[in-house]
Amino acid sequence: MLDVITKTNKSELILGGQKSGKSRRAEFLARDWLLQSPDHKAILIATAQPWDEEMQQRIARHQRDRAERVPGLTTVEEPLQLSQTLNRLSRPDTLLVVDCLTLWLTNLLMPMIGENTINSPSNQHLAGYFTDYAAMLSIAISKSAGPVVIVSNEIGLGVIPMGHEVRAFVDALGKLNQDIAQVCNKVTLMAAGLPLSLK
């Protein structure tokens, strides 16, 4: 399952559904990076926000599991300013893991739901809003001094529920995944804990 992150294969987008093994693969890549050299560091940039009690419990569980599986992995919480954080933490000896783009996009979307911006089918602000953030993130990944692993959900394979909000989110995430796949050296689709190499 494990591929080695090297200087020639320095960025990877990991896609998959819920409980497909996306985060586990990212953790294994981080652990392998740490084992390659005592000088190596690994930082996980967590985008989740504790919106409710269930999410709080989920975040706490992920933190415990990561601490057991990858003891040397440092966690930085950043729900919004993802490209700026990548730029700030980027170093040749440091692997950066972003987990995940889906929650990051949700965080960007939440204020717009409150303003009813997303509910207007004719409003073009939404597409431009996400395009700017995706462009900045793509640049940060391509210019990173060290390796970067990006985790994101693939949610467009099943039946899409009714509602403009849901369809707009699925479209935005699908476009974001395409943009990030273009700049990553490697793209992996996870299913049942097994990797399928797409790029």
Residue ranges of model-derived segments:
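SAM-dependent methyltransferases
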Residues: 1-9, 132-135
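Short, conserved beta-strand edge motifs with alternating hydrophobic and charged residues
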Residues: 45, 75-77, 97-100, 150-151
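Residues at the starts of beta-strands that form the adenosine-phosphate
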Residues: 40-43, 94, 147, 186
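Loop/turn-to-beta-strand initiation segments
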Residues: 72, 92-95, 144-149
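A basic- and aromatic-enriched beta-loop-alpha substructure that forms the phosphate/nucleotide-
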Residues: 79-80, 88-112
